């Protein structure tokens, strides 16, 4: 514990908490202090100017990160017939319908993302209490309930992430690994910011992207001057 506290203190001393760092500098600093014995994730928190109490100001969506996530994603697809074949051909790890639903009910959940064809939702809808709390319930708003299951599978395998503002209006996402280059991480963040801008509620007033900070799994947060990447 003492060793961990000392390490965190050393990291914190390298970061000026009152400074807004240019994105490239912030990423370089996050990589520098990511000294754990594993490949730490690089995470971002973005405060949005939305009123989360209003139903028309929900910010939710998905984006394919151009440099990927650095994570191997196991994809399950609820489908049958031609759609099941399309999913398998696209690289899905698990495909099924009633049989897959029974596995889920038995708490045998061996996947990181679930996709469903619209006609399968009569079965998948029964799994909400199991998949919902795990963040695995297919949803058309993020493209995981779709007729084009093949594209959904390919996007997931290519590094697609989902985002959603929490009750405080903050979006938390993993945008890569500490082993990624600064340029690769920067490309991913720009793609996420672009997706957030496209998801801006029409009723949102004032400044939309308010604050941004990045950190590694074991590192301290670095505040980012996001003025140059908001458009």
From Swiss-Prot:
Q: Which Pfam families match?
A: Ribosomal_L1
CDD domains assigned: Ribosomal_L1
Judging by the UniProt lineage, the source's domain of life is Bacteria
State the Gene Ontology terms under molecular function.
rRNA binding; structural constituent of ribosome; tRNA binding
UniProt-listed GO biological process terms: regulation of translation; translation
Q: GO terms for CC?
A: cytosolic large ribosomal subunit
Q: Which positions, given as ranges, span the membrane?
A: none
UniProtKB keywords: Repressor, Ribonucleoprotein, Ribosomal protein, RNA-binding, rRNA-binding, Translation regulation, tRNA-binding
As for what it does, the entry says: Binds directly to 23S rRNA. The L1 stalk is quite mobile in the ribosome, and is involved in E site tRNA release.
Under NCBIfam families, the record lists:
rplA_bact
Family as reported in the entry's similarity comment: Belongs to the universal ribosomal protein uL1 family.
Subunit notes for this chain?
Part of the 50S ribosomal subunit.
Q: What is this protein called?
A: Large ribosomal subunit protein uL1
